[in-house]
């Protein structure tokens, strides 16, 4: 008998209850006791098994992006970009690739409201013929920091106070006051887009700079953008309070019910493309995650569309055990030297092994759908039946060989080993440009959110003054208005 053919599955359900080992259970409502009112007997194995399984149902939640919802669908190429990449799933218009998407909030726990002001995760796993490609992004195109070394600190600052377990603005503003580059992300965070109406009306961004390579080996920097065809919609504070008070899972429910009703959400995928030889032409570093690439300088190019047309079958199996990883790339798409991306390439697999175990890639939602082969064996919860005798490479007893070489970026890297910030910081131009692009009422809401945050009692005069200095450098009138409402004199 091949045990791999008889894995536990709902398709093998019997019409009566059984133990985990398959033995029939004739009474699933009463414990085995001495008499009708006597003590429970330890030999009631079914009771012990049932309770012990129940107390182990929960796994560690994600350290970030714990609250989320998933859906399945497909990606379809609509425009030919083979001059930019040799990626197989982008080989021609009309090609479709199955995928799963997970939307999420970032900071709070698994059961937290979906109406809080918080960045949203926008992660896509495509099951391509050449392996899984994961694009693990957010609903903002920028991030608060530009170096992965700072990631634990910025998350700690946003997480609840370890003493009181209350999220407090003084901690956020204190930490990020040391990082003026964070102001550009605050121009999104404290903007109206800080609370999306739901997941269907939300943009997605790859955030990082990636590299595309064509079959000739030519490499270009790219950024990825997801644009919802139904438009972007956001909640103002009063709406968020009302909706969150009625339903803390409103975005999950909206996504699930929309797909169930046949109202399939759709996004268009666009890219921005930059020749690495031209990066010095701009006043920002293209590998800086705190910066956008202005679309008037580097226009969007259409690539394809994503349609979510199927709800997940089981929330735990396809949402909680779903493991996205920016290290999962395919030939034709590669990393860049973006410091945040480089750190994430290591971090995700590490946290998945902690949360799900060393064999998390064997779980159906994570496993590639294409043929694959490796010599990763055994470990906790390895449920794959393998009968090879050779578990090493190379071998004269096994004909496994190296794959055909595919193009990767080739360049010479020279320099002195050092820990340093990038040379081209330019921290205030982009947030100032964004602020000035808004209508007056939108500007006023942005100012009010800053005033509310900076008015918290534990935000010191020094921290307030620092932020007013940053806001003034972005836009003089912005800094003056915030300072005036706080009764503080600007230093610039």
From Swiss-Prot:
InterPro entries recorded: Catalase (IPR018028), Catalase_AS (IPR024708), Catalase_clade1/3 (IPR024711), Catalase_core (IPR011614), Catalase_haem_BS (IPR002226), Catalase_immune_responsive (IPR010582), Catalase_sf (IPR020835)
Major place of residence: cytoplasm
Species annotation: Ipomoea batatas
EC identifiers of the protein: 1.11.1.6
Reaction(s) catalysed (UniProt annotation): 2 H2O2 = O2 + 2 H2O
Keyword Oxidoreductase: yes
UniProt-recorded name of the protein: Catalase
Keywords for the protein's UniProt record, in alphabetical order: Cytoplasm, Heme, Hydrogen peroxide, Iron, Metal-binding, Oxidoreductase, Peroxidase, Peroxisome
Gene Ontology cellular-component annotations: cytosol; peroxisomal matrix; plasma membrane
UniProt-recorded Gene Ontology molecular function terms: catalase activity; heme binding; metal ion binding
Binding partners and assembly: Homotetramer.
Cofactors (names): heme
Record-annotated active site: 65, 138
PROSITE patterns: CATALASE_1, CATALASE_2, CATALASE_3
